[in-house]
């Protein structure tokens, strides 16, 4: 019995020992795994830190190399520019030497020509003297007396003519000095600014998302904008802006304002575009009148007919040879006033004539024709002074100036236009070509309006749908294309797009 109890106790003790051993081993293993896990995390963190340091070092090296390359590039660029400047200076020096040699050669040739002429004259005089001596030997006393009187009379006439020519030359020199003095006074007392006109306007966008809204579904919105406004709208990868392009400054300014309002409003669809366009057109009509009125107030030229006031304001949206028409007009008016004052003329009348001398340009883009004839007709219609009308004709040589004020306007116009950099011939030739294309289209029957777009490579012609069929529209496009080909010189091709649109509107109540 005791042995049995002892056996059971031994087994129980062994079981307890085994359990304790198992628990110890388990705890030991967990601690070991925890320790290993901590070591692994520490190593991973160390590796990560080391990798980050290596990355930073690599980035620093790359940045250093980029800066070194940039510095080297700038250094080489400066060297190239210096070399170019040196070459330009050397070329200019060579050109000056060539000019000096040509001038010297010309002078030598002139002197040789003078010497030859003198030699011929001397030989002629010798021959004449010999003939006279031979003739005198056979003359009577009366014949000799008459001969001497005739020669004295000829010599006297020659001396009188010489005196007249000398005084004419003196008068001419004095006149030139006086004219130069007047021009110098005018240019000194008036210092105007000049900025060339561009062919594009930039419209800033709040975000690039608006580009998609302006384009619209399947390009619906941008097509409506271009067709209604008559401009090119360029949307590219440039962030935050779109371009509005047109040779017509007034049309381009209206288009820019329409797009700005649409972007601010957020509602962009064809119906809204038409509504905003009508509103902006009325706004610009009022704006041009206000601008013209402000100019007249500044110059003190009231009263003037309101139609002329509006056209003066509209000159702001017209350019000639890249020179803004309003800026040119104001410059001419102020220069003419100074010149008229120096010559004892009517300053106010010269100022008024200068302001109105190019008034016809405000309508030439819409009407076509000569701005001189249009301007003169407008001033006659609104009872302007005859001197103003004469100045309009005279500044392009259609008439001779009949007053000091007209002459001052002509001189001021030439001075303003002839300044270096004031005008750009290439831009004007392009603008003239585009205007010719539009005028050919608008001259056709049943054409309501026409817009040249894509730098003059396409023209959109809007016709009256009630008076023209689809077949007639096709024939019209071919007719316009043929006339453009015959009358306008242009590179490449021009697409003629005749648009016949019918709208039906009903109201549900």
UniProtKB/Swiss-Prot annotation:
Q: Which family does it belong to?
A: Belongs to the RNase Y family.
Q: Mind giving the lineage of the organism this protein is from?
A: Bacteria, Pseudomonadati, Campylobacterota, Epsilonproteobacteria, Campylobacterales
Look up the EC number in the record and give it. 3.1.-.-
Localization annotation: Cell membrane
Could you cite one Gene Ontology molecular function of this protein?
A: RNA binding
According to its UniProt entry, the protein's GO biological process terms are: mRNA catabolic process
Which NCBIfam families does this UniProt record tie to the protein? HDIG, RNase_Y
Extract the InterPro entries matched here. HD/PDEase_dom, HD_domain, HDIG_dom, KH_dom, KH_dom_type_1, KH_dom_type_1_sf, Ribonuclease_Y, RNase_Y_N
Keyword vocabulary terms for this entry:
Cell membrane, Endonuclease, Hydrolase, Membrane, Nuclease, RNA-binding, Transmembrane, Transmembrane helix
- Residue ranges of the TM segments: 5-25
What is the uppermost EC class here?
hydrolase
Q: Which organism is it from?
A: Sulfurovum sp. (strain NBC37-1)
Name the HAMAP family on file: RNase_Y (MF_00335)
Q: Which CDD domains does the entry link to?
A: HDc (cd00077), KH-I_RNaseY (cd22431)
GO CC annotations on file: plasma membrane
Free-text function comment from the UniProt entry: Endoribonuclease that initiates mRNA decay.
HD domain location is 325-418
Which residues does the UniProt record annotate as the domain KH? 199-265
Q: What is this protein called?
A: Ribonuclease Y
Q: How does it sit in the membrane?
A: Single-pass membrane protein
């Amino acid at each position: 019995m005791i042995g049995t109890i002892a056996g059971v106790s031994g087994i129980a003790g062994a079981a307890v020992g085994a359990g304790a051993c198992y628990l110890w081993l388990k705890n030991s293993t967990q601690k070991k795994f925890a320790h290993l896990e901590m070591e692994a995390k520490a190593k991973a963190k160390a590796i990560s830190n080391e990798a980050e340091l290596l990355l930073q070092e690599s980035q620093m090296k790359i940045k250093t190399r980029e800066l070194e390359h940039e510095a080297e590039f700038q250094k080489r660029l400066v060297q190239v520019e210096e070399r170019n400047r040196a070459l330009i200076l050397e070329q200019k020096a060579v050109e000056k030497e060539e000019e000096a040699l040509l001038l010297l050669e010309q002078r030598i040739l002139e002197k040789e020509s003078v010497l030859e002429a003198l030699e011929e004259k001397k030989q002629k005089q010798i021959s004449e003297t010999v003939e006279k001596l031979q003739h005198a030997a056979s003359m009577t006393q009366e014949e000799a007396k008459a001969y001497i009187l005739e020669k004295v009379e000829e010599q006297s006439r020659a001396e009188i003519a010489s005196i007249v020519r000398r005084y004419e030359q003196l008068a001419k020199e004095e006149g030139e000095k006086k004219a130069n003095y007047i021009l110098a006074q005018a240019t000194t007392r008036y210092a105007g600014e000049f900025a060339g006109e561009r062919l594009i306007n930039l419209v800033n966008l709040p975000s690039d998302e608006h580009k998609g809204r302006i384009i619209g579904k399947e390009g619906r919105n941008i097509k409506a904008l271009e067709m209604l406004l008559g401009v090119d709208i360029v949307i590219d990868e440039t962030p935050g802006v779109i371009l509005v392009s047109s040779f017509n400054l007034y049309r381009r300014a209206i288009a820019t304002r329409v797009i700005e309002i649409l972007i601010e409003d957020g509602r962009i669809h064809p119906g809204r575009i038409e509504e905003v366009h009508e509103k902006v057109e009325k706004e610009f009509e009022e704006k041009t009148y206000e601008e013209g009125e402000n100019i007249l107030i500044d110059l003190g030229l009231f009263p003037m007919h309101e139609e002329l006031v509006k056209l003066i304001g509209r000159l702001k949206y017209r350019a000639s040879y890249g020179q803004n028409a309003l800026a040119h007009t104001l410059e001419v008016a102020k220069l003419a006033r100074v010149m008229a004052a120096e010559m004892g003329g009517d300053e106010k009348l010269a100022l008024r004539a200068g302001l109105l001398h190019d008034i016809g340009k405000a309508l030439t883009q819409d009407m076509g024709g000569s701005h001189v004839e249009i301007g003169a007709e407008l001033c006659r219609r609104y009872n302007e002074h005859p001197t103003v009308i004469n100045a309009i004709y005279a500044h392009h040589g259609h008439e001779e100036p009949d007053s000091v004020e007209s002459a001052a306007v002509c001189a001021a116009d030439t001075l303003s236009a002839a300044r270096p950099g004031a005008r750009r011939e290439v831009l004007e030739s392009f603008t003239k070509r585009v205007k010719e294309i539009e005028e050919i289209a608008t001259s056709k029957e049943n054409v309501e309006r026409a817009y040249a777009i894509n730098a003059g490579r396409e023209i959109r012609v809007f016709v009256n749908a009630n008076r023209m069929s689809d077949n007639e529209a096709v024939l019209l496009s071919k007719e316009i294309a043929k006339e453009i080909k015959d009358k306008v010189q242009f590179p490449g091709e021009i697409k003629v797009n005749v648009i016949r649109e019918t709208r039906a509107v009903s109201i549900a109540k």
